[in-house]
Amino acid sequence: MIRPRFRHTGRPCCLILLCLLLLPWLGACAPQYGVSVDSLRGPQADSAGTVYVPRPGVEGMAEDDLLFRDVAAQLEPCFTARGYTLKLDEQTQDKSDNLVFISFGISEPDVRIYTTVSYVPYTWGRGHFRHTRWVREEETRTKVFFHAGLLLEGCTRAPDGGRGKNLWRTEIRCTGQDDDFRTLLQAMLPVLQQHLGKDTGGRRYFVVTLDEDEAPVVEEKEVTAN
């Protein structure tokens, strides 16, 4: 079974922003994840039908790869929520069905060092001889992040059964402190469910909170990338 690696495509500031979004919540009880999504939709998508057959987009990955099949199954509710049908292995396929190519992976550990500077008053002496001096103190923290990527490309089926015309393209990224892709995928699904196959008008950023006892909490964040 292939373990796909996430390749850092596009501007690296996107990954830095996802890390910075997480810093205020790293001490929270429930796990927090930084998620971004960028989706495009072509004019032919509205008339192309709503049935899709999943195909692996990772080079060298077979359709019977266990991880690919597991990821496709977890994506099915997102397709259903958007009014699409995702045909899995046991369902009969038709030549008129569209295709969706699924690419995904996880990065190597991303070690980041953050330094916090503060000034602490240091006082000595008494009465008129009392003096105060502000002393600079630095606190250094090391955090290890993992970046996961998921790319879904919807297209028509060509006469030879391969990739036809592009219909839509949805790319989603997730940053967290878990080193397992399937764990990071759980944080991506609530955002994907709202934006799959849509036109987002650019990249949008979210903080997702996952709690075993409650539904995921998704909060959109306004960020500025220089």
List where the protein language model places each region.
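Short alpha-helical segments and helix-capping/turn motifs at coil-helix boundaries
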Residues: 7, 82-83, 137
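N-terminal secretory signal peptides that target proteins for export/translocation
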Residues: 1-10
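Post-signal peptide N-terminal segment of mature Sec-exported envelope proteins
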Residues: 38-57
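N-terminal segment of the mature soluble domain
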Residues: 53-113
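C-terminal/domain-edge helix-coil "capping" segments
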Residues: 29-43, 139-226
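Surface-exposed short loop/turn segments
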Residues: 102-160
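Bacterial N-terminal signal peptides
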Residues: 14-25
